[in-house]
């Protein structure tokens, strides 16, 4: 089916919502097929059952933050040592997803979904998180797209190129990543309060797709999910209960739903066993979400001026704290019988410069070889053009084995300590680092405000996680007036210096994107927001949460009911 959303006609119809549920987003007949009374009732049930738990978990995050801000550092929890030391395993891996050597990721856009499913990757992670700007239109179209993808009818007609896209006979297995616990969905009010974004994402997707998915993709299992940005196992416990609730509603076996948790916050690295334990009936492993992890390192240590990061480009997987995290993740997953997934190299193909392209591909190749040799069972690709390289690295090492869960134990990683996981990254800080953060942060935010959650910038993939690093690093450097020691000039970062950098980088952006795009895009608004966040006395928790209201579009309702 081709997706054609209706032309907006104000106030002609409203969604058929159950009691206590108010949909404030634009009405569209196509969206109404997703926002059915039954599906909304399911979302409302989830919201009512779990909102107290979610609020408590968010309060615990704030409490932990207060402790870190008073000088504490995260570490292993003595009270859950029995879980770390215990002899237990997760449920066995469903055959449909035993082989996950290359997974492609991307936002839930129609053409991207078709391209990703056809890409030759084993898995496609359809993203409502880092790669999506969660506007009402993006979210609802995303659900329509996923439903069409799961039932196999999805097509897309690119009119400018007169090209029709449809699914191949063989496609990647679909995983869906709902938003993190922290993000509200302001277009759906439940009992007068914005719904929890991830419960909307999960609830709508699950409700409409579980039956078909299990039949066609999961060989009796599924649906499959990726779970982002958790900080503690109590958050995994909520997800486990959500899954059990959904399985009960659907009348399917407990343990049908499976999820891979991204370890992408610093506190969560100390909770990997505990997270797997909570989800042991529903787990298919952990993934190294390296970009959010770096962001989280800065956020966790926002009040620790002795733990400043060097230039963003220097914080890679070669840093001791990053390597330790990846090694410990592999050991933990394999001990518990599940996949240890690698992460995303940020390089993407460079079409107009063969030499630069070869260098970019070589960086990806090296990153993937490092991952597979370390024992990872699979990895992420940001772009279809990277899949052959990722495949080659993983297949070259693993051969026909679907994964390395049983063959690579990494017992040596048992010796990794809290100090290893927290070791301060090494490297210099430069004015160019400050400039690049500023240029990337502003352009990313401008894209996000106008509906794109992942964009190519300076030949790299940028999304919410990578842009967060730019924001918090600028904040940290300004807050502590750090010396730019890589320039040899002894310059310290100040609000004044940052102000000049912003002005100059805005001029550069205008030159690079052209006057028209600069005028019609939201660069000036993005600049204001980004500057405010970088110079705020208190660090905002999330870039996207702080500016979310700018993409909320409430439509008046109740004029007539169809
Ligand atoms: C830190 C993290 O969370 S990582 C996970 C979240 N981030 C992501 O998922 C980012 C995914 N990647 C992307 O969004 C894109 O690759 C971008 C934005 C970086 C670059 O996209 P583009 O500028 O469209 O790339 P480009 O023009 O080279 O695309 C060429 C073709 O590949 C397709 N393509 C590019 N990336 C993807 C993808 N990830 N999935 C499916 N198709 C893709 C394009 O749709 C285009 O298709 P077409 O030839 O049929 O028109
Ligand atoms: O979600 C992935 C990350 O690196 O962040
Ligand atoms: Mg992430």
Swiss-Prot record:
GO MF term set: malate synthase activity
Keywords recorded for this protein, A-Z: Glyoxylate bypass, Glyoxysome, Peroxisome, Transferase, Tricarboxylic acid cycle
Catalysed reaction equations from the record: glyoxylate + acetyl-CoA + H2O = (S)-malate + CoA + H(+)
Subcellular location: Glyoxysome
GO cellular component, one term: glyoxysome
Annotated knockout phenotype: No visible phenotype under normal growth conditions, but the frequency of mutant seedlings to establish into plantlets with true leaves is decreased under short day conditions.
GO term, biological process aspect, one: glyoxylate cycle
Top-level enzyme category: transferase
Annotated EC: 2.3.3.9
Residues forming the catalytic site: 177, 463
CDD domains, per the entry: malate_synt_A (cd00727)
Pfam families xref list: MS_C, MS_N, MS_TIM-barrel
Pathway membership: Carbohydrate metabolism; glyoxylate cycle; (S)-malate from isocitrate: step 2/2
Motif (Microbody targeting signal): 560-562
Superkingdom of origin organism: Eukaryota
Entry function: Does not seem to be essential for lipid utilization and gluconeogenesis in seedlings.
Family as reported in the entry's similarity comment: Belongs to the malate synthase family.
Name assigned to this protein: Malate synthase
């Amino acid at each position: 089916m081709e997706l054609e959303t209706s032309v907006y006609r104000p106030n002609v119809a409203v969604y058929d919502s159950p009691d206590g549920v108010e949909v404030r987003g634009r009405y569209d007949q196509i969206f109404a097929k997703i926002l059915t009374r039954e599906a909304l009732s399911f979302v409302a049930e989830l919201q009512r059952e779990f909102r107290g738990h979610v609020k408590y978990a968010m309060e615990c995050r704030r409490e932990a933050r207060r402790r870190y801000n008073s000088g504490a550092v995260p570490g292993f929890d003595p009270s859950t040592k029995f879980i770390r030391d215990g002899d237990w395993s997760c449920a066995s891996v469903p055959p449909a997803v035993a082989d996950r050597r290359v997974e492609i990721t991307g936002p839930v856009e129609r053409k991207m979904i078709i391209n990703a499913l056809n890409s030759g990757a084993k898995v496609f992670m359809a993203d409502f998180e880092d790669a999506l700007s969660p506007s009402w239109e993006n979210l609802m179209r995303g659900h329509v797209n996923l439903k069409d993808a799961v039932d196999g009818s999805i097509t897309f007609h690119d009119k400018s190129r007169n090209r029709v896209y449809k699914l191949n006979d063989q496609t990647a297995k679909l995983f869906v990543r709902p938003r993190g616990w922290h993000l509200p969905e302001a277009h759906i009010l439940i009992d007068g309060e914005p719904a929890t974004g991830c419960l909307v994402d999960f609830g709508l997707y699950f409700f409409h797709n579980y039956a078909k998915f299990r039949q066609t993709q999961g060989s009796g299992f599924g649906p499959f999910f990726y779970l982002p940005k958790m900080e503690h196992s109590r958050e995994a416990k909520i997800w486990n209960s959500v899954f059990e609730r959904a399985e009960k509603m659907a009348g399917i076996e407990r343990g049908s739903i499976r999820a891979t948790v991204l370890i992408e916050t610093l506190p969560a690295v100390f909770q990997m066993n505990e997270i797997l334990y909570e989800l042991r009936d529903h787990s298919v492993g952990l993934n190294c979400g390296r970009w959010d992890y770096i962001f989280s390192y800065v956020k966790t240590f926002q009040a620790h001026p002795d733990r400043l990061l060097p230039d963003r480009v220097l914080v890679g997987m070669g840093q001791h704290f990053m390597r330790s995290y990846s090694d410990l993740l592999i050991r933990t997953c394999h001990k518990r019988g599940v996949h240890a997934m690698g992460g995303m190299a940020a390089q993407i193909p460079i079409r107009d410069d063969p030499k630069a392209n070869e260098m970019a591909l070589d960086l990806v190749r090296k990153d993937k070889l490092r991952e597979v040799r370390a024992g990872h069972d699979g990895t992420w690709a940001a772009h279809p053009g990277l899949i052959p390289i990722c495949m080659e690295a993983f297949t070259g090492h693993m051969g026909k084995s679907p994964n390395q869960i049983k063959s690579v134990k990494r017992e040596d990683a048992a010796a990794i300590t809290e100090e290893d996981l927290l070791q301060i990254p090494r490297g210099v800080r430069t004015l160019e680092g400050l400039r690049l953060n500023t240029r990337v942060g502003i352009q990313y935010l401008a894209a996000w405000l106008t509906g794109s959650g992942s964009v190519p910038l300076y030949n790299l993939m940028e999304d919410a996680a990578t842009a967060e690093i730019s924001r918090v690093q600028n904040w940290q450097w300004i807050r502590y007036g750090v010396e730019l020691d890589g320039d040899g000039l002894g310059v310290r970062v100040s609000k004044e210096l940052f102000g000049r950098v912003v002005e100059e980088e805005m001029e550069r952006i205008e030159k690079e994107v052209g006057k028209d795009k600069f005028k019609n895009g939201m660069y000036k608004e993005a600049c204001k927001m980004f500057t405010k966040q970088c110079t705020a006395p208190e660090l905002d928790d999330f870039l996207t949460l702080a500016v979310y209201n700018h993409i909320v579009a409430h439509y008046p309702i109740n004029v007539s009911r169809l």
